[in-house]
């Protein structure tokens, strides 16, 4: 299993599979064909069906168009066998195709084809299921974040510090930005309004309202094409930051503990990515917001003193109640129902944490 560095990525929204992946593919293709006279890019399946709303064409054209004229072709009715997010890049010179390259955006900004990943990450974790890692924790007397540290090395904390700083900056920007989101649905930003109202409520209601505001802040920034952290994807990027920011602010948790919780969240997200999928186009929103909720629940449970068994149970519960959730955004925009779904998932993550902590009293349970 690869590093959590491959899961947490700092990028522009609104979609890791529909913008980050295609842009990365365009950059790789351009590096091989800087002398091309023109380019032709064909989008298939989900990329073509929702690409306009996800700004897929804008991401690709921002790379290729400055070098040579680029034609975009949309084929939503054609789904290539390997994955719904298929792309065909063609470089033309003298009226002839120099290279035709079929590639797929498989979620979280990652690329793959039928044969191999474009840049095969180094597998650093020997265990690839939570069941195995839980047994390791019990045998070693350690918990999940220590498993991450053992195999990632101490420099993982510097990386996670950058990730956490970016998450906080995104929330703070989102809380201050107002107005209508781009795309034509005329969806107004709500994070700042929720935050103002939260300050007038009693402690319990205020805390939950702030949680919603934090999740909305990141999700609205994502919808506007702002900088977010994939956790595990752009479309689900509001859940983990909201939960951690809420706990950090309300309980004055030191940063070092937040980073450890983030490591645990990354581990659980990585497990889902390795054994299943975090691509909404491939497995629906259960693989995006569902996995994000599990990541956040695991992180929260750790911060509240949960044992490895309780942490695992919180993550399991958080994910299983999102099973079957589809990815069917209105007009292909990462706005309805995506934004409010992040807020609901953040609340559900804290509910799963509480439920798990009440159910189990020891790791022997």
Protein language model regions, located:
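C-terminal regulatory domains involved in ligand/effector binding and gene-expression control
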Residues: 70-200, 210
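Conserved small/polar residues in nucleotide/adenosyl-binding loops
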Residues: 360-365
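A glycine-rich helix N-cap at a beta->alpha junction
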Residues: 61-72
């Amino acid at each position: 299993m690869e590093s959590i560095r491959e899961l947490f990525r700092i990028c522009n929204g609104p979609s890791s599979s529909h913008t980050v992946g295609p842009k990365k593919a365009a950059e790789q293709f351009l590096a091989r064909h800087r002398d091309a006279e023109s380019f032709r890019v064909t989008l298939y399946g989900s990329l073509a069906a929702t690409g306009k709303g996800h700004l897929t064409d804008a991401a690709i054209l921002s790379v290729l168009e400055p070098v040579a004229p680029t034609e975009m072709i949309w084929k939503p009715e054609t789904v290539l066998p390997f994955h719904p997010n298929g792309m065909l890049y063609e470089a033309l010179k003298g009226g002839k195709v120099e290279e035709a390259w079929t590639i797929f955006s498989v979620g979280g900004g990652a690329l793959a084809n039928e044969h191999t990943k474009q840049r095969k990450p180094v597998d650093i974790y020997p265990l690839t299921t939570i069941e195995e890692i839980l047994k390791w924790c019990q045998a070693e007397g350690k918990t999940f974040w220590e498993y991450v540290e053992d195999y990632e090395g101490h420099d993982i904390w510097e990386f996670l510090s950058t990730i956490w700083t970016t998450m906080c900056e995104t929330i703070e920007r989102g809380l201050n930005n107002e107005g209508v989101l781009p795309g034509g649905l005329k969806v107004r930003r709500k994070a700042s309004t929720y935050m103002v109202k939260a300050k007038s409520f009693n402690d319990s209601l205020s805390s939950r309202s702030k949680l919603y505001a934090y999740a909305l802040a990141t999700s609205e920034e994502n919808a506007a094409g702002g900088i977010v952290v994939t956790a595990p994807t752009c479309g689900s990027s509001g859940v983990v930051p909201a939960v951690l920011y809420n706990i950090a602010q309300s309980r004055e948790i030191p940063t070092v503990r937040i980073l450890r919780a983030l490591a645990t969240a990354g581990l659980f997200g990585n497990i889902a990515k390795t054994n299943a999928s975090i691509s909404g186009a491939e497995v629906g929103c259960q693989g995006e917001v569902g996995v994000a909720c599990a990541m956040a629940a695991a992180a929260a449970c750790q911060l509240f003193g949960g044992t490895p068994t309780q942490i695992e149970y919180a993550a399991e519960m958080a994910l299983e109640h999102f099973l079957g959730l589809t990815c069917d955004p209105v007009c292909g925009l990462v706005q309805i129902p995506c934004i409010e779904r992040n807020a609901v998932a953040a609340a559900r993550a804290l509910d799963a944490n509480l439920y798990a902590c009440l159910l189990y009293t020891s790791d022997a349970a």
